[in-house]
Amino acid sequence: MSLPRLLVALLAAVVSLAAAPATNVVFIFADDQRADTIAALGNPVIKTPNLDRLVKRGVAFTRAYMQGGNGGATCVPSRAMLLSGRSLAQIDEKLLKHQTWPSAFGAAGYATFAAGKWHNGPPSIPKSFQQAKVLFVGGMANPLKAPTSDMLPTGKLTPSKISPKHLCEEATDETLAFLKSQDGKKPFFSYLAFDGPHDPHIVPEGFPIDYAPASIPLPPNFLPQHPFDNGEMVVRDEQLMKWPRPEADVKTMLAEYYRYVSFLDVQVGRVLDAVDASPFAANTIIVYAADSGVARGSHGLIGKQNLYEHSMRVPLIVAGPGIAVDKRSDAMCYLFDVMPTLGKLCGVTAPKDSQGSECSAVLKDPSKPARPFLMFGYKSLQKALNDGRWKLIRYPHVDRTQLFDLQADPYETKDLAAQPEHAERIKAMLAKLGSEMKADGDNDPLTAEKIVPAEWKAPTKVPKPGQKGF
């Protein structure tokens, strides 16, 4: 090629790169949504046509996990991990000690916006986002009567007022208004945080999708009662239903829960439609995830204060430019890997304290692996290690260990820990768990100083659960 032609080609390439629009992000975050509540990912009962649309447009992770919690309200650390990119042992739950990823997007020239649930304290909102509307600053409420505030330009919140609509619907309204206001001069990062399908499972009167409890199958790992004391047998969530768990009551709860998921799905559809109709459809990444799963009858439990798959595994769907279409990935990752991945895709420099591993290679080729193992924790009561096939859960306070072969037993119904042929595996996994915990700054012992009996007797009377914080 002659020199003049080479110069012309190089100039054209430079102009093309300069003209390429920056990548936008629309992040939708649910609250307590099990990974198995999406029709396109295998649930034959639930109706989620819009989440199904998103699944077909991108990559759905089948082994994405939250890492655990330091108290019953696991939403708090889960959101802190997501937004900071830091592990459970290393987070500041109030998000004040470390730069958040939304702040990093803002520093990179992005317009940043949040709407919906914020469970990490008011001071961290202006540290993370430039604009925020319809913020529910708390853990849980009746979503038809939720107190919400807007963030003023000063960073202060307006006095709270009762949302005139269902909180998830109004937060979606404000997100759509933000998207409509974008003029293309700056890329944007939008964060829509639902407070559902967290209980109470309330949707607007007249919402047309309904489920008959009799039509809802029980979870494959349903039990009337958990077989031993896991350390949190009477936490608020577990008081939502009497013991032993009646099958009919579990089906009714699941019917209400599925209906709430379907209501959220409608809001997801509104966001997808808005992005599709916008001038920035081709350069916008859409992410759907949840802060945790929840038991809802699995293993005799109702809540999320446990380390079983139904509570730790979360939906994670990513779609957008350069991302594979209609693919599943069994790469293992944490929720706190998601923001580093988005940063990599968008060219945003990571906060210096972010610890997550970016998984952008998986989004291009879903057959690629991510993390070789994952570890989990709930208080000092439960610790776990998952190497992709084998999962060990340790309960120090009762000196009990469980071992599951997730490949053969994905619902964790067959505890293999007592079988002699697995003794060496358990020994090695306990050693690995202990060393990895120590390396991450988790100094909880794997054997408690005081061992209590594993046998547990249910209360004859169920206390009325409080509403605070969960």
Please give the residue ranges for each predicted region.
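N-terminal secretory signal peptides that target proteins for export/translocation
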Residues: M1-L3
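Residues forming the ATP-binding cleft of Hanks-type serine/threonine protein kinase domains
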Residues: Q407
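Short arginine-rich
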Residues: K438-D442
